[in-house]
Amino acid sequence: MNSEASGILKHARNLLDPEQKRSSAIAGGFAWWGRDIRTEAVISSLPDQPPIFRIGSDMWKGFEGSLSDMALLSSILKDSTLSAPARMKTDPTRIGLWVDIPLDQEKGSWMAGFLALVAAQQNAEAARFARIGHAWKADNCNLGSNEGIVPSPYAEIETELLTGLGRRDSLFGKDVGLIAEQMESESLFNVHAGIHGVSAEVNLGSQTALLRFLTKQPHPRLGNGLFCFLTIPLEADPSLAMRMNELGLGLVNPIYGPGSWCVGEVGLTHLSFYPNAIYRDGLSSWVVDWSVQRARWIVDVILGTVLGGTVGTSGGRNLPLYQSLIEIYRGEHATP
C-alpha cells in the first residue's frame, strides 16, 4: 500500500471508530475515478466552526443516475440539515453537483467517514451499476459479472474497511423482528418476516407498492448488509427513474437515506444498500423510517395527483414529472 493510501486508511479508521464522539477538526478527502466519471467526497472544518461534509460529482452526461444518487447518499446524516439546496450546473457536455452538510460534532463523525468511502465505491468506480441501462436488475439483484469495472486505486482501503466486514453474515439480520414490528406500527399491511428479511405493502388505491428489506442478498462488491427495495406499479423507464431522482433532490423537506430510483423487472424501484460496515444499534429503525417516508411520498405523488390533489411547486413538486406519472399511471390501470 502506498503512503497516500495508508494515510487515508488511517484517517478513515478513525472516522469509522464508533467510540469517537467528538472531533473539533476533521480533515480528509477521498476521490475515486472510474470509466468517464470522477466523484469526490471531502470532510473539512475550520477552527470554531462545525465540520462540513461536502460531496460532489462531475461526470459525462449519461451517468446522471449516479449524480443524483450522490446527493441522495449525502442526506443519510439524519441529524444534519443541508446548508444550501443541492446545486446543479450544466454545460453541453458535463454535469456537476455539490452538496454541503454541516456535521453535528457530537454525532455522526464515523458516518461521515463511511460516506466518503461508499459514495465513491457505489457511485464512481461501480458506475456500470448506475441505474440507467446497465446490468442492474433491481428486483432480483442480477448484477452481472465484474467485467469492465476499473480497479480502484484505493482497493485495499475498500477491502479492509468495507468488503472485509461484508464477508460476515449480515449484521442487520438480528434486527428483522424489530423491522417487522416497526413496519406494523407504521400501518403498513401484509407485513411478513422470514429468513431472508421483511416485506410489506403500501396502499396506492387500486394497487399497492411493495417495500422489502433483504438481509441474505450480498452486494457484489461490499458484501453482506441490508438491501432496501420500494417497488411501485409504474413503467420501469430509465428516464422516469432519473426524473424521480431529480424530484427527490428538489424536495423542501428531503427524504433521508442513500439510494436511487432504477429500473426493476416488475416496476419502478427505489434501491438502497447499507453494508455491514455502517451497522450500529438503532440504524435499522432509521432505515425503516426513511423507507416509510419515501413510500408515503409516493402515495402523495400518485394518489394526491391522480385522484384529485393539487399540483404545484409546494414541497419541491415538479409539474412535468407529475404529468408523466399521471399518464403512466392511467395507462397502466386503464379500464378495458
What are these regions (language model features)?
Residues A84-A120, A124-A138, Y256-Q293, W297-V311, ...:
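Well-ordered alpha/beta subsegment
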Residues M1-S68, S75-T81, G282-W290, R294-P336:
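Hydrophobic, helix-prone linear segments
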Residues A27-F63, H196-P238, R243:
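Hydrophobic-cavity lipid-handling domains and compact docking modules
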Residues F63-D69, Q105-F114, P218-G223:
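Intrinsically disordered, low-complexity coil segments
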Residues C141-E156, G248-N253, G312-E327:
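Unusually extended, aromatic-enriched hydrophobic runs near protein termini
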Residues P51-W60, A116-A126, T163-D169, P220-T231, ...:
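Short, surface-exposed, charge-dense and proline/glycine-enriched linear segments
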Residues R54-W98, G223-P275:
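Short, internal acidic amphipathic alpha-helical interface segments
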Residues M1-V42, K78-R94, Q105-A112, A127-K216, ...:
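Charge-rich, low-complexity N-terminal segments
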